[in-house]
């Protein structure tokens, strides 16, 4: 067996820092004297929540392809050096009792290496798409209202859904090229928690487990965010910062027909972004 290191997943971090700084500046009306909670209260029972974000994920684990065992140990700064494109976001539709959501990440990296006087090009694409639904089974009022004019609460919501993952690799050398890919879909079940810590601050956390040998052997997703309610461009907005982990253990026959493709990798790192309510 031969062991090597690979790189795979977010130049966007700098843009994100700038975006977050602009968000803070745009939230100047967040001072108590200027913030109109009644105006911020939703006029409809249904709310659409749009949440762009950046996940500065590092990768740690093992992978196998064509009889080669690969040690996956990629800090985010290495990914950033080879990053071409990163798109990440979440959209949720809820009436407060139940709702649906869509979450997606697409990351593309590229790099060139020298091997035996030949230049080898490696392009890697990773796509993760999740769709799910949730239902609120518990809600406890905590007293007072949020900055958006709604009662402060603690709520718990079971969730169920599907998560699709696709890995693509394009290799080029001496004018020749080859492309290989693998994809799988995992069902998952989990819990979401939302706690209004104060008028402006809130904490959200979510954890789910899936795979069950339907797609991967096992997948675990966990994330938690501290949020601050404010206003951006006239819309109620929550600035968020937190941490996320996604572990996947997937195995299938690879393109050789005699070896296994294995992806036993943990992605983890800080997340920063915002949620705008409509």
Predicted regions, residues:
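Membrane-embedded beta-strand positions of outer-membrane beta-barrel proteins
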Residues: 50-52, 91, 102, 133, ...
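Outer-membrane beta-barrel "beta-signal"
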Residues: 130-133, 230, 265-278
């Amino acid at each position: 067996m031969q062991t090597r290191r690979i790189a795979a997943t977010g130049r966007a971090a700098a843009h994100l820092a700038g975006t977050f700084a602009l968000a803070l500046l745009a939230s100047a009306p967040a001072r108590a004297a200027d913030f109109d909670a009644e105006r911020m209260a939703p006029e409809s029972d249904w709310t659409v929540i749009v949440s762009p974000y950046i996940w500065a994920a590092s990768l740690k684990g093992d992978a196998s392809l064509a009889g080669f065992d690969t040690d996956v140990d990629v800090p985010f700064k290495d990914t950033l050096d080879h990053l071409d494109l990163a798109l990440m976001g979440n959209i949720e539709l809820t009436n407060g009792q139940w709702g649906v959501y869509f979450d997606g990440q697409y990351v593309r990296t590229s790099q060139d290496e020298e091997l035996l006087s030949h230049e080898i090009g490696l392009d890697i694409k990773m796509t993760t798409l999740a769709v799910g639904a949730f239902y609120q089974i518990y809600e406890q009022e905590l007293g007072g209202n949020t900055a958006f004019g709604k009662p402060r609460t603690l709520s718990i919501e079971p969730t169920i859904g599907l998560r699709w993952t696709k890995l693509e690799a394009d290799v080029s050398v001496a004018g020749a090229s080859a492309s290989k890919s693998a994809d799988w879909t995992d069902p998952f079940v989990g819990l979401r928690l939302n706690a209004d810590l104060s008028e402006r601050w809130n904490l959200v956390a979510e954890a789910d487990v899936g795979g069950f040998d339907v797609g991967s052997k096992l997948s675990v997703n966990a994330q938690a965010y501290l949020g601050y309610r404010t206003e951006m461009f006239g819309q109620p907005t929550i600035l968020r910062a937190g941490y996320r982990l996604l572990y996947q253990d997937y195995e299938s026959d690879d393109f050789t027909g005699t070896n296994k493709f294995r992806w036993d990798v943990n992605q983890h790192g800080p997340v920063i972004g915002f949620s705008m309510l409509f």
